[in-house]
Amino acid sequence: MSKEEILQAIKNMTVLELAELVKALEEEFGVSAAAPVAVAAAPAAGAPAAAPAEEKTEFDVILQEVGSDKIKVIKVVREITGLGLKEAKDLVDSVPKPIKEGVSKEEANQIKAKFEEVGAKVEIK
């Protein structure tokens, strides 16, 4: 039986049949389907307590201060967020406010640079 035939047979199974298959595989090979998750979550007994922190991959750009040229800041907000004029003005009037959330470090730095060009202060979290 080829790999493709096995996959096709699995695709045609019901949920109950799949559950029975998993149980049979666990018994046949002496493994547990949940074991890899439990092992990954628990630190090893001899492992160092403080592992290096993972580098953040998503950042939030927060407008802290508008500066002297509010109109230019509103234009940048509209360019980055796609908001309408009124929504962008309301956002600028109620700082500190998040401008963009969950963006890459590179994009966050580009957004920050655009705001700094028009005199606004931005924080990246």
Swiss-Prot record:
Looking at the UniProt record for this protein, which Gene Ontology cellular component terms does it annotate, in alphabetical order? cytosolic large ribosomal subunit
Checking InterPro entries in the record gives: Ribosomal_bL12, Ribosomal_bL12_C, Ribosomal_bL12_C/ClpS-like, Ribosomal_bL12_oligo, Ribosomal_bL12_oligo_N_sf
Could you list this entry's UniProt keywords, alphabetically sorted.
Answer: Ribonucleoprotein, Ribosomal protein
TM ranges: none
Write one Gene Ontology MF term: mRNA binding
Assembly and binders: Homodimer. Part of the ribosomal stalk of the 50S ribosomal subunit. Forms a multimeric L10(L12)X complex, where L10 forms an elongated spine to which 2 to 4 L12 dimers bind in a sequential fashion. Binds GTP-bound translation factors.
Q: Which family does it belong to?
A: Belongs to the bacterial ribosomal protein bL12 family.
Q: What is this protein called?
A: Large ribosomal subunit protein bL12
Instruction: Write down the species.
Output: Caldanaerobacter subterraneus subsp. tengcongensis (strain DSM 15242 / JCM 11007 / NBRC 100824 / MB4)
Q: What is the lineage of its organism?
A: Bacteria, Bacillati, Bacillota, Clostridia, Thermoanaerobacterales
